[in-house]
Amino acid sequence: PQAFERDPALVWQWYNWRKRLIAEKQPNAAHYASAELAKKLPELLATTQNVDGFHALAGLTGILEMHGNIYRTRCLACAAIAENREDVSPETPCSACGKARLRPDIVWFGEALPKNVLQAIYDRLRSCDAILVVGTSGTVYPAAGFAVEVRRREGHVIEINVDDAHKPYANDIYLRGRAGDILPRIVELI
């Protein structure tokens, strides 16, 4: 937040550059498999810490983006959130109120995660009997605590990851490898 306060033009220049880089890429097999898994398991609650929007682009609806989305803006004047795939500058007006007070709808270091997103996750964690953890270090909270919470209630933890670093929870099933290789195979089995 401090960098944005000091030089919003520079921050927007960086985010516009990142949006262009991401736009050149496509969702991978893991993103598409996640969307298929959600279709087969309607009770699935999908969350991501990524801000690239690839899950939604792959067809996964209702995903909770914990850290926001690089293709959205949030107005500091009226709090309106809007999709914006175009370049943004400090002079870009908000589509809701017309004021030029937009920032990326991204959670920056030192900021709290969106309360509504966290509440939806914790509500589901209280009743779920299993959690699938995919491609994360498992060390950044609060997300690292999700598996801990499920395990505390004697739920099952299934993890897919390329490294087997120590996690603050025990896995029932650990599948070592790339999510893009493993998730599609899981979807085929369901």
Q: Which residues make up each language-model segment?
A:
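Conserved catalytic core of sirtuin-type NAD+-dependent deacylases
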Residues: 1-190
